[in-house]
Amino acid sequence: MTAFVILHYRAIDTTRSCVRSIRALTGDKHIVIVDNASPDGTGKQLAEEFAASPDVTVLLHGKNDGFARGNNVGVRWVCAHLDADFTVVLNNDVEIPQHDFIPQIARIYAQNPFDLLGPDIVSVFSGIHQSPKTLHGCTLESVRHKRACVARSKNPILLLLSSGEKNSPAIWRLVQIRNRKKQHIDTT
């Protein structure tokens, strides 16, 4: 099963579109919407709307802790309550057009086991790949090593998963965390 964590803040129609695109995917899935303390009541609206949906859980987070912590709320919930093979963290403005997205993740994992998987960002205007390339899969150990190097560095590294092209289908901002052993990376 694949879990999808969506961070929600005020844009209810955008979140609904994201949920619709995930529901259209082939494969077993569960959607976790984390409302980041929307002041307009849209989080409560979503909770009521999906209350009878066994494939959607809405978490009403009491305060807006920002992007990373809000997503961590959802990832921690997945680790505690679901036996997911993969957890996909994405923005609520993302729609996934590939119906075989979930089997694609499983195929990639079977070919090259990974702990984190990011997108291949391709500009829709130029066709240029804007993603950093790596020759080997990313493991938790390599992430820990890089994190330790960054912690010792005087110049921290910031990774942005966006090409800056609004509404680009190539910008699906996927970060996948394997939680088979209930491991997670705390970005707080």
Where are these regions (language model features)?
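Active-site beta-to-alpha loop of glycosyltransferases that engages the nucleotide-sugar donor
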Residues: 6-17, 37
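Short, acidic, metal-binding catalytic loop of nucleotide-sugar glycosyltransferases
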Residues: 20-29
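Short beta-strand/loop segment that forms part of the nucleotide-sugar
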Residues: 28-37, 57-61
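A conserved acidic beta->alpha catalytic loop
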Residues: 35-44, 63, 95
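Short beta-strand-to-loop acidic/aromatic patch adjacent to the donor-nucleotide binding site
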Residues: 82-95
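Conserved donor NDP-sugar-binding/catalytic core segment of glycosyltransferases
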Residues: 95-132, 138-141
